[in-house]
Amino acid sequence: MDLKLAYLSQGKLFFKLNDLAVRQIDSRFGQDVINRTIQRQQRNEWKTQGQGTPFGGAMLWGVTQGDQRAIHVQISGVTNGTREGEMLFGLETEGVGGLFLYDWSKDEERRLFHKENLRIRDLARQPETDLVACSQYFPNGTANIAVIKGTELHQITEGDSLDEAPAWLPGARNKLVFQSAGLARNAQGYAVGLGPFAIHELNLDTGTLATLLEDPKFDFLCPRMNAEGDLFFIRRPYETPGRSHYPITGLLADVVLFPFRLSRALFHFLNFMSLTFSRKPLTTAAGPKVEAPDQKTLLLRGRIIDAEKALRESAQNEIPSLVPPTWELIKRRPSGEENLVAKSVAAFDLDLDGNLVYSNGTAIFRSSGAGAPQLLVKGKLIENLTIIR
């Protein structure tokens, strides 16, 4: 194997260099955040003593006992660096986000910039201009495409939508493709639904926006284009949130249970929004919020995935899939002809040399054309991957 891969799993960054073993890359900045938080908790520990009494410290001071497992630090995106041996990655904490440069040959990390409440994901560097495209997320549930030049970040899309997964077009310094879905809001302004994802092409110089793929029955995700103009993307059936079909005999039960189901639906949607913005579930009644390796639920391209259920249902396979076979990797030629590349695809990437790699969520494969795919990596809950040059 002569390929360098970086992939994300539950907010952690992993790197595989050729045939060497996979190694996790830990951010020193992120670890410093954790250490400072723990030290602050320890300094204030006396305020939380005596919690077994009616007027314990926590009640008097309005603070809660800290749990270092609940400290939210995650790597949110990765792309190529400016020189060989380097990669860029985005990092998110509770109140700060930033862009970092990592040299794997020297094991050195350098902070390029950080800002309060910055949430950037889906990084993609333009090899000629060094512009970095990304998805920037906001507390109201929207996300826009932005470009980073040096330490400056500029939004290039806008609207009440979820704009994600930008990718530069080969040979074009000023064009990129991305996926976008509109948000539906009620009269009070709360987001209540997400439309189908479409694929758009944007010219940064002229501001021209062209729709490449759109269908109310499907989501089109993670667009990538090769030098020949072939468009690669993930296609999956669109699901309207909360849409279900019940038999007439269950109508009475539906009426009786309507208030409960309405409350449950509202909670699950708020949980969805929490996962979208902070990647943290709201279900903390059973204990503290734990960013642990055994997390059972994750948000993958606008869809909440029950990882435990998905892996159980595909356990009969040698390598179980995190997503169903309806998540298809498609190659679409400029003529409009489409070919199925693989099924059960959660993420993929391709480079200018024609390498195409994809993941089913638990492993990474290299596509070999007509032959069987080559297994490269076995992992767990793989959310995103990038070929590093």
Where in this protein do the model-derived segments appear?
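Sequence signature of WD/YWTD-type beta-propeller architectures
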Residues: 1-389
